[in-house]
Amino acid sequence: MRLILLSGLLLLGIFLANGHEQDPDGKVLNSLIDALMDLQREFAKLRGAFLTVYKARSFGNGSERMYVTNKEIKNFEALRQICEQAEGHIPSPQLENQNKAFANVLERHGKEAYLVVGDSANFTNWAAGEPNKAAGACVKADTHGSWHSTSCDDNLLVVCEFYFIL
């Protein structure tokens, strides 16, 4: 959308730089201005629609982070690539409500998924006896949101985390 707006501004700038001898009544200029204003209105509508969906999703799951699956089953490295390509992140719940939102996705699909636990995490939800480095260097969440050590080679549900700075 920004590209379209910039293109319109560029055309307007070129028109203004070339003078008005080909458009003495200003019809072309007015047409360009009208088109640019239409694009701005459309952009505002799209932004509003996006924010409405974002607010509804975050209200519905109690978290401002969204956890989304493509229903694929992959290992940790494939998950990392998929989330990066989608401009998301490997889930890293920092609060109980975020972990609950993440667990809701897992429960709905009846699958486990990887997550990342930071060294300075204030919130953790390790299952009894965990973390267990002998089980593996990665972490997975079960359908209840409890965290377990696991191998990074396990094939688990692909879930990516998305959050927005507004």
From Swiss-Prot:
- Keywords carried by this UniProt record: Calcium, Disulfide bond, Glycoprotein, Lectin, Phospholipase A2 inhibitor, Secreted, Signal
Disulfide feature = 83-160, 138-152
Keyword Glycoprotein in annotation: yes
Q: What is its main location?
A: secreted
Q: Which Pfam family name is an example for this entry? A: Lectin_C
Tissue localization of expression: Expressed by the liver.
Q: Does the record's keyword annotation contain Glycoprotein?
A: yes
Q: Which InterPro entries match?
A: C-type_lectin-like, C-type_lectin-like/link_sf, C-type_lectin_CS, CTDL_fold
- The residue ranges of the C-type lectin domain are 46-161
Glycosylated residue positions: 61, 122
Protein location? Secreted
Q: Which GO terms describe its cellular component?
A: extracellular region
Instruction: Quote one Gene Ontology molecular function term.
Output: phospholipase A2 inhibitor activity
Q: Which Gene3D superfamilies match?
A: Mannose-Binding Protein A, subunit A
Spell out the family assignment given in the record's similarity comment: Belongs to the alpha-type phospholipase A2 inhibitor family.
- What biological function has been recorded for the protein in this entry? This phospholipase A2 inhibitor binds directly phospholipase A2 in the presence or absence of calcium.
Outline the subunit composition. Answer: Homotrimer; non-covalently linked.
Could you tell me what this protein is called?
A: Phospholipase A2 inhibitor clone 06/08
**Organism whose genome encodes this protein:** Bothrops neuwiedi
